[in-house]
């Protein structure tokens, strides 16, 4: 599963890009 996170991805996840949600930039992590 993939998630949008702030401020960064959890250990073991990879960042594949960004998400824009609620006016903020989130890391897109899988």
Swiss-Prot record:
It is found in: Secreted. The keyword Transferase does not apply. Belongs to the alpha-defensin family. GO terms for cellular component: extracellular region. SMART domains: DEFSN. Disulfide bonds join 2-30, 4-19, 9-29. Signal peptide: none annotated. Keywords: Antibiotic, Antimicrobial, Defensin, Disulfide bond, Fungicide, Secreted. InterPro entries: Alpha-defensin_C, Beta/alpha-defensin_C. In low salt conditions, has antibacterial activity against the Gram-negative bacterium E.coli ML35p (MIC=2.4 uM), the Gram-positive bacteria L.monocytogenes EGD (MIC=2.2 uM) and methicillin-resistant S.aureus ATCC 33591 (MIC=3.5 uM), and the fungus C.albicans 820 (MIC=3.9 uM). At high physiological salt concentrations the antimicrobial activity decreases significantly: E.coli ML35p (MIC=7.1 uM), L.monocytogenes EGD (MIC=1.8 uM), S.aureus ATCC 33591 (MIC=>50 uM), and C.albicans 820 (MIC=>50 uM). GO terms for biological process: defense response to bacterium; defense response to fungus; killing of cells of another organism. This is Alpha-defensin PhD-4. Pfam families: Defensin_1.
């Amino acid at each position: 599963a993939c998630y949008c996170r702030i401020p960064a991805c959890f250990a073991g996840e990879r960042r594949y890009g960004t998400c824009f949600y609620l006016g903020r930039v989130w890391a897109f992590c899988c």
